[in-house]
């Protein structure tokens, strides 16, 4: 059975450059890792009070974003854009103690 995680990125588009918005949009969509039976749904919006995450850092040069849950800021998530079909996701603690191995996700069509 697949584990499904929803990620609702909450941010103010008026405070971002066009390049930063484009970088975020690379990650919007549905992604899956069939081997680990994990899926994630990444979207923009605060239309729900659940699974809300705020963006901490946008690295447009490396197509990477860092974000954390509004409810638990101790865990930091890092998304790296690999290509149009793949992203990498890893977690780290706010104190910088340890980082998980990246998990590769494939875009679901």
From Swiss-Prot:
InterPro entries: Protease_inh_b-brl_dom, Staphostatin_A/B, Staphostatin_B. One of its GO terms (cellular component) is cytoplasm. The keyword Transcription does not apply. The keyword Manganese does not apply. Its main location: cytoplasm. It is found in: Cytoplasm. It comes from the Bacteria. Keywords: Cytoplasm, Protease inhibitor, Thiol protease inhibitor, Virulence. Signal peptide: none annotated. Induction: Expression occurs in a growth-phase-dependent manner with optimal expression at post-exponential phase. Up-regulated by Agr (accessory gene regulator) and repressed by SarA (staphylococcal accessory regulator) and sigmaB factor. Residues 97-101 are annotated as: Binds to staphopain B. GO terms for molecular function: cysteine-type endopeptidase inhibitor activity. Forms a stable non-covalent complex with prematurely activated/folded SspB. Specifically inhibits the cysteine protease staphopain B (SspB) by blocking the active site of the enzyme. Probably required to protect cytoplasmic proteins from being degraded by prematurely activated/folded prostaphopain B. Also involved in growth capacity, viability and bacterial morphology. Belongs to the protease inhibitor I57 (SspC) family. Inactivated by staphylococcal serine protease (SspA). This is Staphostatin B. The lineage of its organism: Bacteria, Bacillati, Bacillota, Bacilli, Bacillales.
């Amino acid at each position: 059975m697949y584990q499904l995680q929803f990620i609702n990125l909450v941010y103010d588009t008026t405070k971002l450059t066009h390049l930063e918005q484009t970088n975020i949009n690379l990650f919007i969509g549905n992604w899956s890792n069939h081997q680990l039976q994990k899926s994630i749904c990444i979207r923009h919006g605060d239309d729900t009070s659940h699974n809300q995450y705020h963006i901490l850092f946008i690295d447009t040069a490396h197509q990477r974003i860092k974000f954390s849950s509004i409810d638990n800021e101790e865990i930091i998530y890092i998304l790296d854009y690999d290509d149009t079909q793949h992203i990498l996701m890893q977690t780290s603690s706010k104190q910088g103690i340890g980082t998980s191995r990246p998990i590769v996700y494939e875009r679901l069509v």
